[in-house]
Each structure stands twice: as C-alpha cells, then as structure tokens.
C-alpha cells in the first residue's frame, strides 16, 4: 500500500512540476527547474518505504524518481503543445528528450531512497539536514557551475528563485537543529 501511495505522489509531483515549469520559459521555468525537490522526492519515498531494508528504500526511491520523471516528460506533451504526431510517437519523443535526467534519476533515486531509509531507521538529524541542505547547496552549485564551466546566464536572470530556495533550506536547517536540541534536552 505504501508503494502505491509513493507512486501516486510521484506521478502527481511529476505532472505538477511539468505544469509549474510551463511552456513560456521565464520565471515559471526557473521555478520548475529547481532540482532539490527532485532529490527530496526519493528521500521521502525511502522514508515512507519503512526502516527494515535499505534495498527496499533504494528500490522505492528509484521507482518514485522514475515515475515522477516519466510523468513530467509525458505531461510535457500537453503542457508544451506537442500534438502533431500519433500519441505513441509523442511519448517516445518526450521520453527521449528526458533521457539525460532519467539516467540521473536511476542513480540518484535509489541513493536518496536508501538515505531516507537510514534517516527513518536512525532518526538521523544528519539525513534531515542533508534534505534541507539540498535547497541551500543547489544555488551554490549553480553559481560554481556558472563561474567555472559553460554555465548559462539563465539561472542568474531570476535570482529571487535561488535566494528563496536558499532561504527555505536555511529555515528548514534551523528548525531541524532547534528540534534536535530540544529533543536532546527533554
């Protein structure tokens, strides 16, 4: 039953991110391109899967990532208005356009799913901080990529997205640390 709930949530997440991203680029596309939620999804899926087996957490995290990514790219058929071919062709084209990220999800999903299981099993503050820290570290990673590599100016066009993401991560980290301190005092 838990796996069904995770798959349903992953499906809704993928469709929602596609709709949020939209077809017009700009601010909405920048919000839709935030990566941290895509890593948080399998981590939460691994947590929901239970605490018995790391393998189960990894499997459920991988399935959640795959379902969400497929939902995202198939939803793009309608969000982006690709309706000139028969539906099976459209699905194939949509999934082919996401091959790079689907491959990444096949690795990151199981890794973060297993981390979710570890976090649940050990009530790990470190795993909770990692989850919150994703929102802080992503903008920094993009800045490093921009400065050191072939980064694009696109991510710098809407700094409010990255500042807000960092603030969300910092607030979450603060709440986790405060909660952990209170729990250790009691």
Predicted regions and their residues:
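Membrane interfacial helix motifs at helix-loop boundaries and amphipathic/re-entrant anchors
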Residues: 15-39, 73-103, 139-165
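Hydrophobic cores of alpha-helical transmembrane segments in multi-pass inner/ER membrane proteins
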Residues: 38-48, 101-114, 165-178
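Internal alpha-helical transmembrane segments of multi-pass membrane proteins
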Residues: 51-62, 117-137
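Residue-level signature of transmembrane alpha-helical entry/exit and packing/kink sites
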Residues: 2-6, 57, 93, 97, ...
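Short helix-perturbing small/polar motifs within transmembrane alpha-helices
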Residues: 3, 106-123
């Amino acid at each position: 039953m838990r796996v069904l709930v995770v798959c349903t949530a992953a499906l809704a997440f993928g469709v929602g991110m596609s709709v949020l991203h939209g077809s017009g680029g700009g601010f909405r596309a920048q919000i839709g391109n935030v990566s941290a939620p895509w890593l948080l999804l399998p981590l939460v899926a691994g947590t929901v899967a239970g605490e018995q087996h790391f393998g189960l957490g990894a499997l459920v995290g991988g399935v959640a990532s795959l379902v969400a990514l497929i939902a995202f790219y198939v939803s793009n058929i309608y969000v982006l208005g690709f309706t000139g071919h028969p539906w099976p062709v459209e699905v194939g084209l949509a999934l082919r356009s996401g091959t790079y990220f689907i491959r990444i999800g096949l690795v990151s999903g199981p890794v973060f799913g297993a981390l979710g299981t570890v976090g649940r099993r050990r009530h790990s503050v470190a795993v909770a901080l990692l989850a919150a820290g994703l929102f802080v570290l992503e903008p920094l990673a993009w800045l490093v990529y921009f400065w050191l590599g072939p980064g694009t100016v696109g991510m710098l066009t809407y700094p409010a997205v990255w500042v807000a993401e960092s603030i969300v991560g910092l607030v979450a980290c603060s709440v986790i640390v405060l909660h952990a301190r209170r729990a250790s005092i009691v």
